[in-house]
Amino acid sequence: MKYLQKNISKYRLTRNVLLLGYKKEAENYIHNCNLFVLTSKYEGLPNVLIEAQKFSIPIISSNCPTGPKEILLNGKLGDLFKVGDYKDLARKVILFNLKKTNLQKKSLLAKKYLFRFDAFINSSQYEKLINKI
């Protein structure tokens, strides 16, 4: 974290890059973002990506095991980069800042797919499956 803070200051990005750490009410912050970046090495179901989709925030995510690739439909709903390939991540962030349209289109499309994570819909589907047994 200190390394990141040092580089944020070094490159005079303190007004553009915030490292907030864990926040209990992430929704209070996420809707103000222009871009959401997930750099995880491992995830289960990264709810934070679903939250970013809810607010139509463009997403760039590591293609870590289980989660981002499925949520972003293999890159259809956001951009993916190989875990640890920070040059590709940097390229994608720069490209987003220069030409936002492609990633913004993906983020708007993502909102149409949010029903996949609706608890009521999923519980109804599970109930139907259980009743078939």
PLM segments and residue spans:
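Aromatic "clamp/platform" in nucleotide-sugar-dependent glycosyltransferases that forms part
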Residues: 22, 41
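A short, well-ordered alpha-helix in the C-terminal region of glycosyltransferases
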Residues: 88, 95, 102-116, 125
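A short alpha->beta transition loop at the rim of the catalytic pocket in nucleotide-sugar-dependent
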Residues: 34, 56
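Conserved acidic donor-binding segment of nucleotide-sugar-dependent glycosyltransferases
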Residues: 73-86, 95-100
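Short acidic/histidine- and often glycine-rich active-site loop of Leloir-type glycosyltransferases
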Residues: 51, 64-75, 79-80
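Short hydrophobic beta-strand element within catalytic cores of glycosyltransferases
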Residues: 58-62
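Nucleotide-activated donor-binding/catalytic signature segment of Leloir-type glycosyltransferases, i.e.
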Residues: 4-21
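C-terminal alpha-helical cap of glycosyltransferases
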Residues: 94-95, 119-133
